[in-house]
Structure formats: C-alpha cells, structure tokens
Amino acid sequence: MARVCQVTGKGPMVGNNVSHANNKTKRRFMPNLQYRRIWVESENRWVRLRITAAGLRLIDKNGIDAVLVDLRARGEV
C-alpha cells in the first residue's frame, strides 16, 4: 500500500540530507501517517482511515461527514 494520506493526498517527498560540510545525499520525507478508526454518527459505524496528522485536523475542522463526501467522490472509501 502506498504511503499516501486518504484525506489530504499527501505522500512522500524527496529532498537532501545536508551535512555540516554541506555534502548532500538524497532522502525521502515521509508523511506522518496513522491508521485511525473514526466514529461516523450519521452512519452509526466506524470508518478506518490511513490519515496524516494534518488529515486529522481537517476532520476536526470540517467534520467527518464532509470529509467522507469528498472521499467517496474520489473513490477512496
């Protein structure tokens, strides 16, 4: 499974490790992903999502129902 947030769509980014001597080596910045079970009151059931911390804050802000409408429109859930 890809390391992508189901809510925000954020995935890994590519960048550099930079040493004190300014040597650069490639690295990946991984999103802060967690599996979360979120209670959906309108459907009276749990929904399991793989989301980032930013996705959790988005659910707190907009509500799980609005986020689920967007996910279903994209075919994620």
Curated annotation (Swiss-Prot):
<dbReference type="GO" id="GO:0006412">
    <property type="term" value="P:translation"/>
</dbReference>
<dbReference type="InterPro" id="IPR026569">
    <property type="entry name" value="Ribosomal_bL28"/>
</dbReference>
<dbReference type="InterPro" id="IPR001383">
    <property type="entry name" value="Ribosomal_bL28_bact-type"/>
</dbReference>
<dbReference type="GO" id="GO:0022625">
    <property type="term" value="C:cytosolic large ribosomal subunit"/>
</dbReference>
<dbReference type="GO" id="GO:0003735">
    <property type="term" value="F:structural constituent of ribosome"/>
</dbReference>
<dbReference type="Pfam" id="PF00830">
    <property type="entry name" value="Ribosomal_L28"/>
</dbReference>
<dbReference type="InterPro" id="IPR037147">
    <property type="entry name" value="Ribosomal_bL28_sf"/>
</dbReference>
<keyword id="KW-0689">Ribosomal protein</keyword>
<keyword id="KW-0687">Ribonucleoprotein</keyword>
<dbReference type="InterPro" id="IPR034704">
    <property type="entry name" value="Ribosomal_bL28/bL31-like_sf"/>
</dbReference>
<protein>
    <recommendedName>
        <fullName>Large ribosomal subunit protein bL28</fullName>
    </recommendedName>
</protein>
<comment type="similarity">
    <text>Belongs to the bacterial ribosomal protein bL28 family.</text>
</comment>
